Amino acid sequence: MFDRTWHISRFLLEYGADVNIKNRYGSTPLFEAICNCSCKNVKLFLENNADINEVDLDGDATLMKIFNYNCRIHSGLNSVHLRIARIVIPYLKVIGLKNKHVKNVHAYKQNINFFNSVKQLRLISDESDREINRMKNTILRKNKFGNDITMYDILLEKNMNQLVQIIKNPLIKKRCSELILFKRIVKNNIIYIENRYQKIHGANTVIEFYQYEYTDKWMILPQEIKINILCYLDNKELDYIYESSLENNKNNTSDKKYDVCC
């Protein structure tokens, strides 16, 4: 599994391949890619929720064993191994920040402890911690009663309703471009939030134009209130509103044509 064939991996994932499927040796595509130092495949699998804390047939963290093997066989890690480490460590950190219970998982603890025990890897881990702290202090919106919205919220996809309302602020992409280790994760989260922004505003538009029986009640609400209400819906519900509103308009148009003909 090499960088030159990463588009095949992407094709298979798009058509429903299991990103965590194991071969006869108990290894998943992610760890095959790590063993072959395929940066493109590693990024692809992690973006598609590959389990970075997967264990091998002995019940130990596969990630730790791969890096430990490379450390012993090469008397340290070379530049390619460190490039892979700079990809996986941020994902490992985010998993621990999003889910506190993960910190008690045996494989996660093995991975973290190993990365902190090797100087080359510890430097990357420390760099990632400093970048996390900068994100915590990068305020995107100040709130009256505290709980300011920061780049850290985008990293962890917290306070999604407020993020949707400010996602078009050019400051966000500017601050994202200044990141190093977490840039890819934050950039993908921004794309997700922008997509949700489009769905929310699309749902609002079709309600205003096509849901005739609710238009009067909906239109008297301030725009901010309407958006806040729609923020409580998930993407499937927003898609349903959009599609059903268009279908409702189509049926109403057909009825009017029928009335004219009669």
Curated annotation (Swiss-Prot):
ANK repeat boundaries on the chain: 25-54
Superkingdom per UniProt: Viruses
Keywords: ANK repeat
Name of the protein this chain belongs to: Putative ankyrin repeat protein FPV243
Native organism taxonomy: Viruses, Varidnaviria, Bamfordvirae, Nucleocytoviricota, Pokkesviricetes
